[in-house]
Amino acid sequence: PSVFGTSEPQENAANLRTRGFELSVKWQDKFLLAHRPFEYRVGFTLADNITEITKFDNPDGQIDQFYKGKRLGEIWGYTVEGFFQTDTEYLDHADQTKVNRRIQRNYLINHPVAGDIKFKDLDGNEEISPGDKTLSNPGDLRIIGNTSPRYSCSLNLGFNYSGFDFSAFFQGIMKRDWWPGKDN
């Protein structure tokens, strides 16, 4: 049906599979300290999972949609070779005017200058571009990271002694790639 005022909502039509593990280890004990019982406890947890699309109707293989084999949280981007060191170095490098927003917005300097990021020409066509943004033609785009948190862990410490109770809990994530957004 026609939708007025907004785009139609996305369909929940993908099949996916999540695989992972959880590990929890705990130790508690007590002993006498100055003729009084001292109880202590230590606990550690570690968990990880990966979610992958197993079925989705994306016949063109558009990389900005779900596709079979996609891991949730994928970050597609350009590979960085370094920085342009001089204002003329761009002459010996693949054209990147399509992907450099500073060049697109600046009417005075229409080429990369010293300090601009130098992207790698992965498809060898002397132009940095997104191709068709499909799996079969991603241009110079590649998977450069994943925003899904990996290896969540926690540590729980505590003791009881002579009417005094102490407990501390720490948690964190050991790996996560961060993407500031397309406008940064």
Regions found by a protein language model. Name each.
Residues E52, N125, I143, N160-N184:
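C-terminal beta-signal and adjacent terminal beta-strands/loops
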Residues S2-T18, E39, F169-N184:
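Small-side-chain secondary-structure face that scaffolds active or pore-lining regions
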Residues N146-C153:
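Short, glycine/acidic-rich beta->alpha junctions
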Residues E11-R17, F21, K30-G145, W178:
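Conserved small-residue
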Residues P1, R19-D29, Y40-D48, C153-F159, ...:
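Membrane-embedded beta-strands that build the outer-membrane beta-barrel scaffold
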Residues P9, I53, C153-L155:
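Residue-level marker for the onset of beta-strands and adjacent loop->beta junctions
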